[in-house]
Amino acid sequence: MYKRQVDSKTSTGTAVFTVYETGEYTVEATQGGQSTSGTVNVTASTTSYAITLAFVSDTLNDNDWDTISEVSDAGEGANYWAIGDRKQVTLNGTVGSLSLSNFSTYAFIIGFNHNSGREGSGRIHFQLAKTALSGGTDICFTDGQYLNTGSSAAFRMNTSNTNSGGWEDSYMRNNICGTSKSTTSGRIMGAIPAELRNALKSVTKYTNNNGSSSASSAVTATTDYFFLLSEYEVFGNITYSNSYEANYQQQYAYYSAGNSKVKYRHNSTGSAAYWWLRSPRVSHSNNFVNVNTSGSVNSSNAHDSLGFAPGFCV
């Protein structure tokens, strides 16, 4: 193998060099005591080859979302970071009826390659949110309609009191979370930074998408970017939702480790909140499951406005 060392201190971080033999070349970059490398297979003398090298910090928050995504693609997230590690996110925009302006919060890791056989590999699963890089408070987002029923834009599962259609057809999924990177108005998708939006990966989630049915056939797949967690993903058991959801889901590592399930209102962090899960309650045509203010499983009417604590994958 032909070897050539190139030292570059260009402002762009780009180095260009010529090799004189075909074959596999290792390219290494060093910066601030960190090193990273990759290989290029040169097969023709008249072709230009490019490789992008990223420096990865073992402090999650010191990495940009592109770097986090590349580490995730390689299935290496757990080699750098830990469950519960946090990354700052600034939110701007209106989600439902909640207006957020330069709201700084922290996404935290809840799983590495979680349930990858069904949901997809090369994914780090996050949830929103915490108030600080360390310590702080677990929060969910609450709007001016919190604990009220109604049909207006708010953090409701549906604008009418029904769980028909389950998670798939819910107002929460389609109008608050959003199902496309390009449909952003009124959705959390539109409030996140563009860098995070570009790094988002779709995930396959299984849920009772019938509503009140207890049949196995009611549990079907959706493709999501933002999603609510399910009863089983949080608690590791089923109390109110379709028992067959457990056949397709796994409890998130963050919650199986015993971390608190209690979340507080983002705009009143001394007040614990009810926060929605995506699972419909079986044998109740108007309820979805949620987590109550003591961190226990609960269910409420679909048109109630409760706390919003979405997950996403990078």
Predicted regions and their residues:
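Generic structural detector for well-ordered beta-strands
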Residues: 16-18, 39-41, 108
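Conserved small/polar residues in nucleotide/adenosyl-binding loops
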Residues: 1-5
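Short, acidic Ser/Thr/Gly-rich low-complexity loop/linker segments typical of extracellular
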Residues: 6-18
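Intrinsic-disorder/low-complexity, polar/charged segments enriched in Ser/Thr/Lys/Arg/Asp/Glu/Gln
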Residues: 14-16, 24, 35-37, 46-50, ...
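A short, solvent-exposed beta-strand micro-motif common in secreted/extracellular proteins
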Residues: 21-32
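Structured interaction patches on ligand/partner-binding surfaces of diverse proteins
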Residues: 9, 30-56
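Collagenous Gly-X-Y triple-helix signature in extracellular proteins
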Residues: 55-314
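Glycine-centered tight beta-turn/hairpin loop motif at sheet-sheet or coil-to-beta transitions
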Residues: 12, 33-35, 100-104
